[in-house]
Amino acid sequence: MNPRGLFQDFNPSKFLIYTCLLLFSVLLPLRLDGIIQWSYWAVFAPIWLWKLLVVAGASVGAGVWARNPRYRTEGEACVEFKAMLIAVGIHLLLLMFEVLVCDRVERGTHFWLLVFMPLFFVSPVSVAACVWGFRHDRSLELEILCSVNILQFIFIALKLDRIIHWPWLVVFVPLWILMSFLCLVVLYYIVWSLLFLRSLDVVAEQRRTHVTMAISWITIVVPLLTFEVLLVHRLDGHNTFSYVSIFVPLWLSLLTLMATTFRRKGGNHWWFGIRRDFCQFLLEIFPFLREYGNISYDLHHEDSEDAEETSVPEAPKIAPIFGKKARVVITQSPGKYVPPPPKLNIDMPD
């Protein structure tokens, strides 16, 4: 295990998002099942923490950008700063939606269409952000997720306001289409990993990478699809499972996503104005971490040494025997040498 390589590819932004979503997905089913009686404002505490860190990081980054004009010429600093501003705008719209959801659940005074209005604005903004991101080679997971789900947001709002009376299985048709695409992605990675495993021209590192990607996608998509199916059947009244048991597959998907952040390069360097990789930033603040970060562990080293020590010594080579009459070379098998039988003399009577 190499901690240095592990943390150099660490993506702190996605790790923060998945951690907050995991905590929220734990608190929400506990509240829905009545195990805890907290206010929904408290249940949404991980979401508030997520948005607070986003706003604080963008504010500090904007301050560093304004006070240090010389930083604007460093590599792709301008592109990363614009990407940070776009992400903050999307997060602020999501924050408005979450505040309206909590207010609607606690007081119940306005329509759900009004609650979902920020999401209706998020989708076109996300489409524009995706176009800009593809041109500048930026990571766009959140933007793509918001842009493709506009129809799903409309259906859910209409269903909650009882304008349409479809079953939840039909309401989530846009989600089923999206999950079908994700299942095709999983199938694609499985096929390619099998092809790489059977190919002899591929190095072991590439095989390992494709197999890891296939396992990761399976562990993310299959539990997520299971969670959605169980939730839809629970909302339609086809089962009486507790919400805690329904959310268990979602926890597995989020834990897998958290694990993938340690091998996922990326992240904007302008959050909190650090202007460098998160690993380098931590090593500068905490120098004692360098001692641990420069250590690598080889768990198979001792086993290989023991195997070399206990290896069977090579059998001594035995010189070939030349047959004079047949003029052939008889090679004896090493380790299986059998001495010739003694010469037998038979005395014949006169």
UniProtKB/Swiss-Prot annotation:
Keywords of this entry: Membrane, Transmembrane, Transmembrane helix
One Pfam family cited in the UniProt record for this chain: Tmemb_185A
Bilayer-spanning residue ranges: 16-36, 41-61, 81-101, 111-131, 168-188, 211-231, 240-260
Topology of the protein relative to the lipid bilayer: Multi-pass membrane protein
Cellular compartments annotated: Membrane
Origin: domain of life: Eukaryota
InterPro entries, alphabetized: TM_Fragile-X-F-assoc (IPR019396)
Stored PANTHER family: FAM11A, B PROTEIN (PTHR13568), TRANSMEMBRANE PROTEIN 185B (PTHR13568:SF5)
Protein name listed in UniProt: Transmembrane protein 185B
